[in-house]
Every structure is written in structure tokens, then in C-alpha cells.
């Protein structure tokens, strides 16, 4: 069949559409645009680490025109652009129906880090990934939302391990022109520049805009020629530098963020602080009100009504504290602006304002400056009330005004392409061959066309179908699980080959035989903070070795994660695990994958059979990595802490221990290690290897079905953002 070539105007329209699409992070949680960018340059997709903007820079105009002249490819591009524009322009959203007032006066969400995708590595861990997922869900729901963070031009560190098995860090310079961000310009088409007073000088900053679907997230950037070198480095690295750098970063984030919003003409209804890093925004809001002639007491009371604070950790090191001397140097301008003495300013960040020895705590400032506060799980809310009761004299612990909203994950953003395509195909087949039953779930599906995939996979009714063998048989589910495990193993082999060749003369043959595609595969991947106890399971070393070497029921472990550059104890955990993987009887059964990031996480949560989580209770405020497993059929095996305490129901995974913990750290570690081994040997391994005559582990798949049904819709950021809206964003 002859197809009419595209005109110059048609080519220009599709080309412009692809460039526009590449600079909106919507493509990162939608499969079809990812496949288009991949097909434009399969090698570039790999070499440029899935960076759509960079791929369009790499592909020549001639190559792009030739691909667009292919009718099938051009049709795919048109369809994706049509869906993209329909998404952006839709007025029929949850936010429009349930919180229309926020479209005019949005929520301003401040976070020191945002994790969106591997192409924009400006997050250090779970706090940033939660912020990114929060923004994606707000976009999907059509909520009035704007994010504020910093643009770290070297991002978070890249990890390698040296010959001594010690973590080393290096930083890659991020080039804005190759990232899914765009400059914020003034009316003259020039970069919009704002200023903020830090210490004894003025810091200028510009902003970049990351389009997260419908929602903008602004990244403040101090790397301007008019700034001194140390000022430019305020936005060099995530959590980089010393405490002086940290307090200056936080002034820039909080004060600078408010000033940028005002320059943009935005009047947020709520300023949501994701951790205490941005708490200086409360002082800037009070300054604005005092500039209108109000006294500090009135200005502070009105500021509190605008602010919400989410605390994320009971770990002491997670709460920034600054000395009186440092505050006097870095934050002296606040005193003049607010007509406060230095001691009065310090009192805003102290539990006891009169205690001159007490440092200034950003969490205390955030709590004092907010109308409401919350923890990130039910247990964490209770722990936080006890932890901060000292700020509320006369109140019993259960009267402390700190609630909770349990975290979630953005299901579409974490769902691997293999699984997404599988469910799309299953749904299409189900609609072609409708079930004639009259159950509520069936009526739901017969009434909804397949036009909004993201909406469907966040509906409990979709996941309720996982319990129905008529919708998906055990054979199909087990085949999917095998494929995902196989993909993880192939990915791990490639990574291990690169790691091995850097340090030794390893060859592909050696690494191609690593990892058994039929073995029970247990994964552990997260920040190597010491309270997360990465090596805990290996306290039962001899017993674990026996399990790993069982030829009838083999077990293998894949670990990944980064320790903070200044956390030597976390680095020792990494060193210990790598040493075991190379020089102990666990060699060939234990593996460590370097440079943990979003891409590695997606491979692991999808391909592992079991997701191990053993924090020292109750220090895991929530945890979210285990939430990403459910949609892929990976089961959680976890201490009863954080989100798992709410998620586990006895049928949808495995519990290590119970809802208690001893006061002694040594006793807790000993008991948890023993319980981990007990659950592994008495529950996990027998359940996984108990096969019927056809080789299918029916009982195991029953747990997989229950996990999908009970966990995925409940622990999603769609549910989480809706809960924040009802509880905290909307005026009471």
C-alpha cells in the first residue's frame, strides 16, 4: 500500500510534539511513549540511561524525519501525543470534583529532594521518592499542586566499590539542556532571578521547572555568575557539605521557595513541609505579614494556619540541629525582619526556649509553625506523639496533635513494562470475552472502557480480580513471575559483569552462570542506614549457608543500596556483605549490585520473590520499597514496623516477629535474627517449593493474589494524596 509522505508542516508538528513530550515527566510513567523513545534509538536508550531529552538531541533531524515517514511509527506518535494532550487538558478529574478550590490556590509542597526517574537523579532516598510519587499522584488526580526543591547540579553520588569492598563516591555534572526541565523566564524572556539574604550576603538564584504531568515542580539553582563560589555550591549536591552549608541550603529552600512562588503570582492555600528542611518558610511567611503592619504574634498565628508538617523519622540524626553561633551567623537576617532578638529566634527552634544550651531544631520550628502535623504510618504517628510530647505541656501523649497518613507509592510509575503489558493484554482479552456473572467486580468492569489505564490500576476493583482464577490462572501468574525473575537475573548478570571487569579479569562465561533462574530469590535494596540492619540475616551465617546450598530448595540473595558518604558504619555493612559474597561459602548465592537507583529498584522489586525488610523497630517510620512489590507479585517478609504493621493480614506475605520489641538493642537484634531464619525455614521456603504435579506452587500464588488484592490499592499515593486532601489540604 502506498502512503502519502508527511508534509513539512506535519513533520514539524510531530517533531515539536516529541520534544514537548520529552520535557514532561508524564512519559516516565506511561509505557507507550517510553517505547517510542526506545525505538528511536535502542542503543541510545541504554547508553543514555533512558533519557528521552538526550535521545532527541542524539538522533539527527534526518533520522527523525525518516522514522516519522514510516506510517506505523507516525501513527504511534500521533496516538501518544493525543493521549498526552487529553491527559493535560482533562477537566474531569478527582481534584476538580473534590477539591476545586485548590486549582486556584494550590498546595505548595516543599521537599529537599524529589525522586522522579533515573534521568533526574536529585534524590538521596525514600524521602525524595515519596515526594516524586506525591507529585505524580497529584497530577493524575488533577489536584492543585506545586512543588519546590533545589536543583543539585551534581545530584546524588554515583556508587562504586573498590578492591577493598569499600564504597566510593563520584559525582556526574548534570546538564540542564539534557534533562526533562525547562528554565523559568521573566516577562522579557530572560531567566527569572530572585534573591535571598544568607548570612552576611545576598544569594541570587534562578529556577527550573520540571513538568510532572499537570503539576509543576520548581528547582532553585544558585549556580549563577553573580554569586561567590561557596554560594554557587549551595545547590551542588544533595545533602552535601557541612552544617554551615546545610543551614544555608535550607534558608534558600524555605525562604527562596516562598519568594519564587510570589514572583510567579501563586498564592498557595497550604504550605506542606515534607520534613523539616524547609521549615524556614514559616519565618518568611511571617515576615510577609509583618510587612503589612502586623505584630509578630499575629503574623505567627496566621502563618500557622497556612502550614502543614510531615515528619518522616524517629531517628535522631534525621532532625537537623544548628548551634546558636551558626544561627547567629547564617540566619541573622530573620531577627531584623521579624523584630526578634537572637534568643527569641532561637526559642522558635527549641523545646525549651529558655535553655541557651539547646540548639535550634528544624523539626521543632516546623511543629511550632504548623496548624497540623503527621507521621507517615499509624505506628509512626504514635511514636511521634510520644517523641514530641515535650512540646505540648499539659497534654497526654494521645492528645499530642500529630496524626498520621500512611505513605504510598505511585503504582504506574513503579510498574515494570513487562507487567504493564501483561495486564493491558489481560484486560483487553477480558473485555473481548465478557464474564456473564453479575458480581460487583464484573459490573464495574463491564461499565468502564479501557481509556484510562492509570485510573484503572489504582481502583480496588481492578486488583480484586487478582483473586479470580477465571481472570488470571495460576499457570499464567506463575509464568509471569518466572519471566520477571529471569529478567532480574539477566539484568543482575550484566551489572555484575561490569563490576567484575572493573576490578578483575572476569569474563562473560563466569557471570552468565551466576544466579539460578529457578531459585527462591530474596531481595534487599534501600539506603544502608544502620537502623535498617542490612546484614541482620547473616547473623545466622552457618544456617543460611545450608539453605543456600540445598540443591532441592536453593535460596539466593541480591542486595543493593548506598550508604551516606559520611556514614562509615553503613559502608562497613556494605563491605561485610560484599566480602561474604566473594570470600565465604555464600559465594555464588549472595550478590551485591552497585549504584542503587530508581532503575535498579524497579528491576529488583519486580523480579525478586521475597522482599526482605528488617529495620530496628520502631525506627522505620513507614518504608515504601516493599509497597512497590505487590503489583509484580513479589511477597514481603518484614518486621512489624512502619507500613507493614498495617498491611500484613496473615495471608498476604510473611511477618518477622510480632507487634512488640524489647528495649535492649542487643536482645532485639538477636531475637529478630532468629525469627527471620525461623520464618524463612518454616514458612517461606516450604511455601515456595511446595509444588503440585504440574510444578505450580498453588499456596504461594494464593499469597501473591492476596498481596495484590489487599496491598496495591491501599498503599498507593492516589489513596495517600486523597487522604491528605481530605484531612489537611481542604479548609475545615
Predicted regions and their residues:
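Catalytic cores of carbohydrate-active enzymes across secretory and cytosolic contexts
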Residues: 1-732
Amino acid at each position: 500500500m502506498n502512503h502519502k509522505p508527511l508534509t513539512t508542516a506535519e513533520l514539524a508538528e510531530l517533531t515539536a510534539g516529541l520534544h514537548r513530550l520529552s520535557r514532561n515527566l508524564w512519559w516516565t510513567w506511561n509505557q507507550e511513549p517510553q517505547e517510542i523513545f526506545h525505538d528511536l534509538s535502542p542503543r541510545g536508550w541504554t547508553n543514555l540511561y533512558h533519557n528521552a531529552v538526550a535521545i532527541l538531541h542524539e538522533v539527527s533531524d534526518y533520522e527523525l524525519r525518516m522514522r516519522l515517514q514510516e506510517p506505523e511509527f507516525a501513527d504511534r506518535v500521533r496516538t501518544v501525543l493525543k493521549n498526552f494532550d487529553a491527559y493535560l487538558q482533562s477537566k474531569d478529574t478527582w481534584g476538580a470534583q473534590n477539591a476545586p478550590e485548590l486549582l486556584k490556590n494550590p498546595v505548595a509542597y516543599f521537599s529537599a529532594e524529589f525522586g522522579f526517574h533515573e534521568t533526574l537523579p536529585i534524590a538521596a532516598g525514600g524521602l525524595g521518592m515519596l515526594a516524586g510519587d506525591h507529585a505524580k499522584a497529584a497530577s493524575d488526580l488533577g489536584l492543585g499542586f506545586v512543588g519546590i526543591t533545589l536543583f543539585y547540579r551534581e545530584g546524588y553520588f554515583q556508587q562504586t566499590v573498590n578492591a577493598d569492598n569499600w564504597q566510593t563516591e563520584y559525582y556526574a555534572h548534570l546538564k540542564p539542556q539534557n534533562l526533562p526541565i525547562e528554565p523559568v523566564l521573566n516577562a522579557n524572556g530572560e531567566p527569572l532571578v530572585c534573591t535571598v539574604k544568607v548570612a552576611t550576603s545576598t544569594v541570587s538564584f534562578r529556577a527550573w521547572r520540571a513538568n510532572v504531568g499537570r503539576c509543576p515542580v520548581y528547582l532553585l539553582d544558585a549556580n549563577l555568575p553573580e554569586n561567590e563560589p561557596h554560594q554557587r555550591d549551595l545547590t551542588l549536591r544533595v545533602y552535601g557539605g557541612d552544617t554551615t552549608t546545610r543551614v544555608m541550603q535550607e534558608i534558600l529552600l524555605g525562604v527562596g521557595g516562598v519568594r519564587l512562588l510570589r514572583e510567579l503570582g501563586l498564592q498557595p492555600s497550604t504550605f506542606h513541609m515534607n520534613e523539616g528542611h524547609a521549615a524556614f518558610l514559616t519565618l518568611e511567611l511571617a515576615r510577609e505579614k509583618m510587612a503589612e503592619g502586623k505584630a509578630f504574634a499575629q503574623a505567627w498565628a496566621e502563618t500557622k494556619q497556612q502550614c502543614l508538617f510531615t515528619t518522616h523519622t524517629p531517628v535522631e540524626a534525621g532532625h537537623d540541629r544548628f548551634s546558636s553561633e551558626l544561627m547567629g551567623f547564617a540566619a541573622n537576617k530573620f531577627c531584623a525582619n521579624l523584630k526578634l532578638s537572637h534568643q527569641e529566634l532561637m526559642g522558635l527552634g527549641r523545646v525549651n526556649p529558655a535553655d541557651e544550651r539547646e540548639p535550634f531544631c528544624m523539626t521543632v520550628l516546623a511543629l511550632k509553625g504548623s496548624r497540623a502535623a503527621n507521621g507517615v504510618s499509624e505506628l509512626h504517628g504514635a511514636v511521634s506523639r510520644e517523641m514530641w510530647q515535650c512540646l505540648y505541656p499539659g497534654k497526654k501523649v494521645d492528645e499530642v496533635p500529630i496524626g498520621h497518613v500512611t505513605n504510598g507509592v505511585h503504582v504506574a510509575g513503579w510498574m515494570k513494562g513487562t507487567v504493564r503489558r501483561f495486564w493491558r493484554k489481560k484486560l483487553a482479552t477480558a473485555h473481548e470475552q465478557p464474564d456473564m456473572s453479575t458480581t460487583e467486580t464484573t459490573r464495574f468492569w463491564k461499565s468502564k472502557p479501557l481509556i484510562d489505564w492509570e485510573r484503572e490500576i489504582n481502583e480496588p476493583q481492578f486488583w480484586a480480580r487478582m483473586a479470580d482464577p477465571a481472570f488470571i490462572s495460576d499457570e499464567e501468574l506463575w509464568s509471569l513471575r518466572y519471566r520477571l525473575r529471569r529478567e532480574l537475573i539477566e539484568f543482575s548478570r550484566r551489572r555484575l559483569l561490569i563490576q567484575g571487569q572493573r576490578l578483575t579479569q572476569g569474563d562473560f562465561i563466569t557471570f552468565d552462570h551466576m544466579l539460578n533462574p529457578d531459585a527462591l530469590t530474596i531481595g534487599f535494596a534501600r539506603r544502608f542506614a544502620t537502623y535498617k540492619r542490612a546484614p541482620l540475616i547473616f547473623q545466622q551465617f552457618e544456617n543460611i549457608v545450608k539453605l543456600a546450598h540445598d540443591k532441592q530448595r536453593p535460596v539466593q540473595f541480591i542486595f543493593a543500596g548506598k550508604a551516606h558518604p559520611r556514614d562509615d558504619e553503613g559502608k562497613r555493612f556494605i563491605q561485610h556483605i560484599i566480602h561474604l559474597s566473594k570470600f565465604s561459602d555464600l559465594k555464588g548465592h549472595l550478590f551485591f549490585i552497585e549504584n542503587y537507583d530508581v532503575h535498579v529498584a524497579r528491576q529488583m522489586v519486580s523480579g525478586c520473590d521475597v522482599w526482605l525488610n528488617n529495620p530496628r523497630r520502631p525506627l522505620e517510620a513507614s518504608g515504601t520499597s516493599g509497597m512497590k512489590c505487590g503489583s509484580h507479585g513479589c511477597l514481603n517478609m518484614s518486621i512489624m514496623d512502619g507500613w507493614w504493621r498495617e498491611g500484613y493480614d496473615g495471608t498476604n506475605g510473611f511477618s518477622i516477629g510480632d507487634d512488640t520489641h524489647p528495649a535492649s538493642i542487643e536482645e532485639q537484634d538477636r531475637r529478630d535474627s532468629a525469627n527471620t531464619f525461623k520464618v524463612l525455614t518454616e514458612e517461606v521456603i516450604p511455601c515456595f517449593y511446595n509444588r503440585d504435579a504440574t510444578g505450580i506452587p498453588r499456596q504461594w500464588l494464593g499469597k501473591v493474589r492476596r498481596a495484590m488484592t489487599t496491598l496495591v490499592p491501599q498503599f498507593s499515593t492516589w489513596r495517600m494524596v486523597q487522604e491528605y486532601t481530605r484531612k489537611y489540604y481542604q479548609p475545615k
